[in-house]
Amino acid sequence: MKAAVLTLAMLFLTGSQARHFWQQDEPPQSPWDRVKDLATVYVDSVKESGKDYVSQFESSMLGKQLNLKLLDNWDSLTSTVNKLREQLGPVTQEFWENLEKETEVLRQEMSKDLEEVKAQVQPYLDDFEKKWEEEMKLYSQKLEPLRTELQEGALQKLQDLQEKLSSLGEQVRDRARVHVDTLRTQLAPYSDKLRQRLATRLEALKESGGASLAEYHAKASEHLSTLGEKAKPLLEDLRQGLLPVLESFKASFLSALEEYTKLSSQ
């Protein structure tokens, strides 16, 4: 119940983007961890699905006639891509770590603001939770006579039960809507306050003579440029690794095409 209430408050206050702030038992992932996980899942998915397509093609009549041996080349390509991913890992991680260091002060200030607002709205959340539990208890009490009547066979038609349940459900929905609207009204000032604080933080960054947003942008661009320079030799290694695969494919295809032409002319 507490998790549901906190999640609801989070939607009112800051949106789903700040949900990790309330998850005390699961520390948020760093940007690098999220990118790495997504990239790994994507690459593995493409690799497996691509290999399936290649296998299906080689098993077809046309694939057998061409005899391109794509699976052999596929394993070589996979090895090359995996090597590139391993080499790029430290470089990309360094980029994210540098960017996190540059924005550390801003993130700390925003965390303080969130903690303060969380403490201020906690009484409203507790009150909402209490009222919600009371509504669920009342709903359960109203359901008990229906359950008893059903067990005793007093309800001859299922339609009667459905009508009574529908009426109870509408009552609970209407009462819950009142509580939610009340909570939204109570939290609205704090939501506005949090947005204003964020705007103030960003404005201060613009006007400060130190770490301004322009500097953040410049530093991020510098880190990206460094990342690109470090990735160039690795991408060149990938290109060189692909050349034998492409040449093998080209030779196999031309050989198969020549063989097919000879058979067609006979």
UniProtKB/Swiss-Prot annotation:
GO terms for biological process: adrenal gland development; amyloid-beta formation; blood vessel endothelial cell migration; cellular response to lipoprotein particle stimulus; cholesterol biosynthetic process; cholesterol efflux; cholesterol homeostasis; cholesterol import. Sequence repeats lie at residues 68-89, 90-111, 112-122, 123-144, 145-166, 167-188, 189-210, 211-232, 233-243, 244-266. Keywords: Cholesterol metabolism, HDL, Lipid metabolism, Lipid transport, Lipoprotein, Oxidation, Palmitate, Phosphoprotein, Repeat, Secreted, Signal, Steroid metabolism, Sterol metabolism, Transport. It is found in: Secreted. Coiled coil: none annotated. GO terms for molecular function: amyloid-beta binding; apolipoprotein A-I receptor binding; chemorepellent activity; cholesterol binding; cholesterol transfer activity; enzyme binding; heat shock protein binding; high-density lipoprotein particle binding. Glycosylated. Palmitoylated. Belongs to the apolipoprotein A1/A4/E family. This is Apolipoprotein A-I.
